[in-house]
């Protein structure tokens, strides 16, 4: 990422901490997923930044010389979120125009259910997770 070994060690520690912290995550379907970012559009892009950063670490094979497991752990965590975002959003011709990504990766919103719009931060996070999966789809561990 930067070529600095001290930074890389801290980045690995921070990445693993994000994925395992009970303060930063909640359990859904027996899996750890990032907690609710909140509905404030000004404060809800943390996940998008985190997913981008995880993608950069997954693509950097030098990380393996410091920790042989972290890239796969990051990949699995990112894949889990992208899958929930993509699988739960209503992509039918009728539902798609009224569907919104929610602030939780597993709770989409829909004006058809009485929800009002969606957070721009939630959209950004969902888009980053889904786009990241295309960027790392060919990574081998």
Question: What feature does the model see in each segment?
Answer:
Residues 1-2:
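Pocket-lining segment of extracytoplasmic ligand-binding domains
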């Amino acid at each position: 990422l930067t070529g600095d070994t001290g930074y890389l060690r801290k980045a690995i520690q921070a990445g693993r901490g994000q994925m395992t912290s009970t303060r930063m995550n909640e359990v859904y379907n027996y899996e750890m997923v990032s907690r609710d970012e909140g509905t404030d559009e000004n404060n809800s892009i943390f996940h998008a930044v985190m997913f981008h950063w995880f993608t950069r670490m997954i693509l950097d094979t030098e990380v393996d010389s410091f920790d042989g497991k972290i890239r796969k752990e990051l990949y699995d965590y990112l894949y889990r979120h992208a899958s929930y975002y993509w699988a739960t959003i209503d992509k039918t011709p009728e539902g798609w125009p009224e569907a919104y990504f929610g602030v939780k990766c597993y709770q989409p919103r829909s004006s058809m259910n009485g929800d009002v719009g969606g957070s721009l931060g939630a959209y950004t996070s969902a888009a980053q997770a889904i786009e990241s999966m295309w960027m790392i789809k060919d990574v081998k561990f």
